Design a protein with these regions (language model features):
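Basic, polyanion-binding surface patches
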Residues: 1-172
Length: 172
């Protein structure tokens, strides 16, 4: 019997970047704002939907950031950051932290977490994380955070993102 062994590499994609993005958009996600304080003491933050739990023991979460992001150096060098899961009524905040060239914290109410990262008022949940590890993959860096503190608002409805639009939850 004769078999053909394929080399252990991925085949090149048979789709465009746009097709890939459109397919990924079919996966509904929550919306987060990741915040930190840089080495100069300036607050930084950005909107991200690339958030996931990793482990319960120890408590680990992950999120990813484009290598080309202006805040990459600050998030890579910092010891702590916070992940704020947005509530259904915070879509304007999601847009504010996604926009470029503005003061993202203008008019935003928050308290500083124990590691110095802003915890946004009204968030459905917050995770205060130690910057445990980073992994470079493709055009992004995956950040793994060890959760030191977390909180959630009982009964809060999360902000959802699907197909390029914001939604709120509705039970089936």
């Amino acid at each position: 019997m004769h078999s053909t062994v394929r080399p252990p590499v991925a085949l090149p994609p048979n789709f465009s970047s746009t097709e890939f993005r459109d397919a990924l958009g079919m996966f509904a996600t929550g919306v987060t704002i990741v915040t930190a304080r840089n080495a100069e003491g300036v607050f930084i933050g950005l909107t991200a939907n690339s958030f996931n739990s990793v482990s319960l023991t120890p408590p680990l979460v992950l999120w990813s950031l484009a290598r080309s992001a202006g805040s990459m150096a600050a998030f890579s060098a910092g010891s702590h950051y916070a992940i704020n899961i947005l509530s259904a009524d915070q879509q304007d905040l999601a847009r504010q932290f996604a926009a470029r060239g503005n003061d993202r914290f203008s008019g935003v109410q928050f308290v500083e977490g124990s590691g110095g990262a802003p915890l946004l008022q009204g968030a459905a949940a917050t995770f205060e994380c130690f910057n445990r590890s980073r992994y470079e993959e493709g055009d992004h860096v995956i950040f793994v955070g060890e959760v030191e503190r977390c909180a959630h608002r009982t009964g809060a409805s999360p902000l959802l993102f699907h197909g390029g639009k914001f939604y709120t939850e509705h039970a089936l």
